[in-house]
Each structure stands twice: as C-alpha cells, then as structure tokens.
C-alpha cells in the first residue's frame, strides 16, 4: 500500500479538526497534547515536502507567523497570570489558515476531512439539542466558561458557544450544497467514498441532517446575534447569485430588515404557532425558545455589550500605535476591537486581514455563486466584531467552506447532469414526419454518389 505525505498529514489534521469541533475532547490534557503532537507532525512533514508552504510562504502565512510570535512574546513578557486561553484559541484557528494555504491550489485534497466532519458534526448537534430538555435552554450559555458543570456536560458530547457559532459560519455553504448535490454526486474525491456516494440519497441525507439540525440548534440555543447572522447570511447566499452593485446598495437594507424581523416578528410568530404544536413533542420546545429569546431581550445584554465595545474602542483611541498590551481593562466581547485595543493598529489590522482574506479571495473567483462568498465575508466581518473567536471557526472557514465552494463551483463547470432515458413502449414501427425525412435527405450526405 502506497502512503503519501498528504495522507499522513490529512490524518493528523483530521484529528485536530475533531478535537476542535468535538465537545467530548474539549477538556483533557491527553487530548490537548495529542492535538499539539498532530500539529507538530504536520509541520515537520510540511517542511520536508517538496514545494511545501514553508519553503515558499505566502503573505497570509508570513503575517500569521508574525501575529503568533508577537502575541506569544507579549504574553510571555507579561507573565503567566495573563489569560492564555483566548490566544490559544486564536493560534489554533490560524493554524488552519496555514494548512489551507498549503492546499489552496489543490482544495480537493481536503475532501476527506470535509466529509469526515460532515458525518460527525450532526452527532454533536443532536446531542446538544437533546441536552436542552435535560439541562434547560441556557445550557449553551453555561458552557462559555470552564467549570465542573462544563466538564461534565461536555463529556456527554454537549457543545456550547463555539459549536453554535461555528454552525453560523458554515450553514450558507451547506445550504448551497444541498441545492446542487445532483451535480457533484457521485463524488470524485476522495475516491474511497465514490462507491458509498452512489448509494441513493445518502449524500443529500447527510447534507440535510447538517442543515436541519444546525438551524434548529442555533434557534433553540437562543443566541440573538447567532440567529440574526444565520438568517442574514442564508438570505445573502440564496438570493444573490452574481456580482451586482445593486446587491451592495441593498446590503444595509437587508441588515435592517434582519434586525427588525428578529426584534419584532420572531417572538410573535413563535407565539402564534405555539398553539398549533400543542399536544406534540414540539410544544415544549417552542415555549422554551420563546422564553429564552424574551429573557435575552429583557436582561439588558445589549447595553452591556455596547459598554464593553466602547471600552475597547476608547482604549484603542488612547493608545492607537502599540495598544495597552494588558487585557485587564479590555471589553473582552469583540475579537477585532480587543485586538486593536491591546496591540495597536498594526497588529489589529493584520488580524482583520487574516480573517477576511479567504472570503475576499473567494469573491474574486466565484462568479455564479458570488452571494455565498459574500455571505461568508459578512460573517467574518460581523462575528469577530460582535463576539470572540474560537478554534473551530478555523475548521469551518479554512476547510469546510473552501471544499464546499469547490464542489458548488465544480457543479457550475460540469453543468447539469443529463436526464435519464425513460423506457418507452411502442406498439408499432416509428414513423418519421414527412418534414423531418425531407430535411434529413437535404443534408450534406444527399450530395454524395
């Protein structure tokens, strides 16, 4: 059996992806050390691979190295009492950017990891969704910080903030995959999945499971920003196909409509359909979602967020060049604003570039599915601006989204599949119309002797 370097690297990165997305592996020193070892294996193999990314690094790779070294050196100088958890999440996320850069000319080589993740993610979606019945609708919020409860629940496969927001990042691509699955099934890559993909409806069933369970989990988790971003990004990816100045002009209008729909229409709509579900298993679930959304809107979370955003912005204005370095007074609710406040304009701009580089690159290359690339860019602008980032975001942005876009674009190039021939029963000889027979005789063959 011939084993390529790519195959060993794919196995290593597949474990890192599983570790970043699986709640069961979120805690545990052994799991973390295994992830670090997997990163080391990939990096060593990449160093010795002909044409590896380290021999000819691209600009995003160089900036990633600069960002990691600068932030790591700063934290080391400040001492061990600083919060390393936030940085570790970002460094792991940026590792996937480096991995993507090593495969960006051969995106199909990441297909095995894509389908592996597409098969495992519904497991965590389902376990987290069903956990709401046992622990309550605020379970995802309680898992945002390390605690004994978080360790116990995560060991059962229940995810929290990072799982919910990772769904938002990948859901537009999953939706377009479902609409175009007939054009790339059976799968060409990886080849070992080709026979399995020929099983009727197995691929659309897998994509549908990710779409339906992911959508339901985001709604029931009750994160206001996640719901708004999900609806907004899905609308962009499904409505807009080609590049259009009108689309850019209508973008503020769509954002306003999404916000108004959430603030005004969503809760009344759920209250309207709640009586229709009475007597079914969904009645209690609908009431839980209504209660969660009403509590979220009444607890003053918006005012608290705005105060934290303004705190980080004020620190940046006071120290625009080098930042305040320490995270003591930073708002800690916006990845972009916090980075600008801590490290200044240069490092903050590098961070924004690294998270928006890939969506902008896709917007240049995707013509008929421009809305998908634009929706991903919108997510990567708004999500880190309004919240913190996490390791699994790198999995979605730099592995899941590029492979999904490649499948959708490949469907456009290949064109629609030819319709199947149907069995036709004739009771007599086929009679050609007189006009068709005359046209056939008047062709170039009719002049031959």
What function would you assign to each model-found segment?
Residues 1-73, 105-108, 181-201, 245-249, ...:
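Transmembrane signal-anchor hairpin modules in multi-pass inner-membrane enzymes, especially those
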Residues 59-71, 78-126:
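Aromatic-anchored transmembrane helix interface
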Residues 110-139, 157-239, 357, 361:
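Alpha-helical transmembrane segments of multi-pass inner-membrane proteins
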Residues 212, 216-218, 234-295, 448:
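A membrane-periplasm/extracellular boundary helix in multi-pass inner-membrane enzymes
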Residues 230-231, 372-384, 389-428:
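Transmembrane alpha-helices of multi-pass inner-membrane enzymes
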Residues 290-346, 362:
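Long extracytoplasmic/lumenal interhelical loops at the membrane interface
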Residues 342-384, 401:
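Hydrophobic transmembrane alpha-helices and their immediate junctions
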């Amino acid at each position: 059996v011939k084993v390529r370097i790519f195959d060993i690297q794919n196995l290593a990165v597949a474990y890192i992806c599983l570790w970043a997305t699986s709640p069961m592996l979120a805690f545990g020193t052994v799991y973390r050390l295994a992830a670090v070892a997997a990163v080391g294996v990939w990096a060593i193999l990449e160093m010795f691979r002909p044409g590896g990314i380290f021999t000819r690094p691209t600009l995003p790779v160089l900036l990633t190295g600069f960002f990691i070294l600068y932030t790591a050196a700063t934290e080391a100088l400040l001492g061990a009492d600083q919060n390393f958890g936030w940085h570790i999440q970002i460094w792991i996320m940026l590792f996937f950017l480096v991995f993507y850069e090593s495969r960006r000319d051969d995106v199909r080589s990441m297909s095995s990891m894509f389908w592996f993740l597409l098969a495992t993610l519904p497991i965590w979606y389902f376990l987290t969704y069903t956990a709401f019945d046992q622990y309550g609708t605020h379970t995802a919020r309680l898992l945002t910080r390390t605690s004994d409860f978080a360790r116990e629940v995560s060991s059962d496969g229940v995810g929290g903030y990072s799982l919910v927001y990772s769904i938002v990042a990948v859901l537009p691509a999953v939706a377009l995959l479902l609409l175009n699955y007939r054009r790339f099934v059976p799968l060409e890559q990886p080849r070992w999945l080709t026979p399995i993909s020929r099983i009727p409806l197995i691929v659309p069933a897998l994509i549908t499971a990710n779409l339906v369970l992911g959508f339901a989990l985001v709604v029931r988790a009750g994160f206001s920003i996640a719901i708004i971003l999900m609806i907004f990004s899905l609308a962009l990816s499904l409505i807009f196909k080609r590049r259009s100045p009108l689309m850019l002009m209508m973008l503020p209008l769509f954002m306003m409509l999404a916000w108004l729909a959430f603030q005004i229409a969503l809760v009344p709509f759920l209250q309207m359909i709640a009586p229709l579900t009475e007597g079914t298993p969904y009645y209690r679930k609908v009431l839980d979602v209504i209660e969660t959304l009403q509590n979220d809107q009444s607890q003053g979370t918006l005012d608290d967020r705005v105060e934290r955003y303004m705190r980080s912005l004020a620190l940046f204005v006071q120290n625009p060049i080098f930042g305040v370095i320490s995270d003591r007074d930073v708002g800690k609710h916006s990845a972009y604003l916090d980075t600008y406040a801590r490290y200044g304009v240069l490092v903050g701009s590098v961070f924004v570039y690294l998270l928006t580089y890939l969506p902008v690159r896709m917007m240049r290359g995707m013509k008929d599915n421009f809305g998908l690339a634009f929706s991903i860019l919108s997510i990567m602008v708004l999500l880190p601006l309004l919240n913190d980032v996490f390791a699994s975001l790198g999995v979605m942005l730099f592995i899941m989204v590029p492979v999904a876009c490649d499948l959708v674009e490949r469907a456009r190039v290949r064109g629609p599949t030819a319709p199947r021939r149907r069995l036709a029963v004739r009771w007599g000889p086929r009679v050609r119309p007189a006009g068709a027979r005359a046209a056939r005789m008047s062709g170039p063959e009719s002049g031959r002797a």
